[in-house]
Swiss-Prot record:
HAMAP family: Urease_beta, Urease_beta_gamma. Its EC number is 3.5.1.5. This is Urease subunit alpha. The keyword Cytoplasm applies. It comes from the Bacteria. The keyword Zinc does not apply. Its main location: cytoplasm.
Amino acid sequence: MKLTPKELDKLMLHYAGELAKQRKAKGIKLNYTEAVALISAHVMEEARAGKKSVADLMQEGRTLLKADDVMPGVAHMIHEVGIEAGFPDGTKLVTIHTPVEAGSDKLAPGEVILKNEDITLNAGKHAVQLKVKNKGDRPVQVGSHFHFFEVNKLLDFDREKAYGKRLDIASGTAVRFEPGEEKTVELIDIGGNKRIYGFNALVDRQADHDGKKLALKRAKEKHFGTINCGCDNK
């Protein structure tokens, strides 16, 4: 007997469904995989019998399990179950929405419950204002955690004040500078141990006082705007 990969998958699903059915009969609460397998195996078997339509099985699939049949939180995890079942007139997709009613369980796995109040970003961090102008002919976008000292060299501003700092904006957001545009931004200190690597390779070390001197020298050598570093540009 030779089986295609799809037939093997269906056979494994049938085994899993039968095992789940046996555990349910013993009063064992089903986990996510077992619940999906039980519903899927039942739908495939009924479709093969050919006595029920897709609509019938979509409705029937919602009656196989109750909240008490599954582990806490499982009902919230199964939003829908889709099964490609073989009917006498061909393969059809049977989609069962909300196959297990949540019942009285109010907590869902991974759910985040937020307070109904505003959140202060970067609370307690001192911010400095910096006027920045884009002298280039293309837009420049700077992300929230980019070391602002090392941004595009066509952005003109006091780079010394930006050393060891990033934009005071929400994580994952950015500020866009259009060509010729000048705007004021707020910067805060980069958190953590302040070891800054990568970006434009102007620091690549601890962002301390000695590192600042070296970074300013590198920035001047690489023409990152007008920089007064007190160093010789050789």
